[in-house]
Amino acid sequence: MVFLSVSGVSKHFGAHIGVDDVSFELEAGETAVLFGANGAGKTTLLRMLASLSRPTEGEITIAGDPLIGSAAVRARIGVVTHETMLYEELTARENLRLHARLHGVDTTRCDDLLETVGLADRGGERVAGFSHGMSKRVSLARALIHDPDLLLFDEPYTGLDQASLQRIAGVLESLEDRAVIVSTHDLERGYRLADRVLFLRNGRLVGDSRASELASSEALIERYDEYCRETVSMGRQGHPGVSQ
């Protein structure tokens, strides 16, 4: 059953096109990884899916309801941006409790999530003293505080210590009951996590493959190169075939 529908979505920045006519669907419980070079449009697309930026064209729906203009639909989304965007003067627990109150969630859930991300013993410490990896884990816990149906995570593995890498990867792999979209440059971890791989190039969705079709992360790179060659050969007027 289709949970997330992205139809003809584009984002223009003056004369520059950041995302160009992207369409795809995602089922509940399915994990998609956005793969592409720097500047491919991954973060721009995630920001529109998170309702942090409005599409210039196109429509995004969740369970059939339009995302734009609906606070109730937006509340079904959890977001972890590349920047942690935490209140550094507050403790990890206080950051989570603040977010819980904003969503009308019982604050007792905060300690459970701190344990989930491996920070149960650090909840009373100010975030200002945390490493980047620890802050990223707090951000993930915050994004899950209201039990969202869709989790969006921009570059979950970048610049993290090994403990944080393992913990975040483990949490993401455990989220089997909700839709997840991850943008990452970590091909090996992204490949292990994905049900689907969405290939972006110059703002366009040039391919969509099932991870089960790809024998390894190296095969993922080969498939991306193949899609890019098809796109170049067909020019701006054509779209390569989409593998289901």
Region locations from a protein language model:
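Catalytic Walker B motif of ABC-type/P-loop ATPase nucleotide-binding domains
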Residues: 151-155
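The feature captures the beta-strand-to-loop junction immediately N-terminal to the Walker
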Residues: 35-37
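Conserved ABC ATPase "signature" region
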Residues: 97, 101, 107-122
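Conserved ABC transporter NBD signature motif
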Residues: 58-69, 73
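Helix-to-loop junction immediately C-terminal to a conserved catalytic motif
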Residues: 50
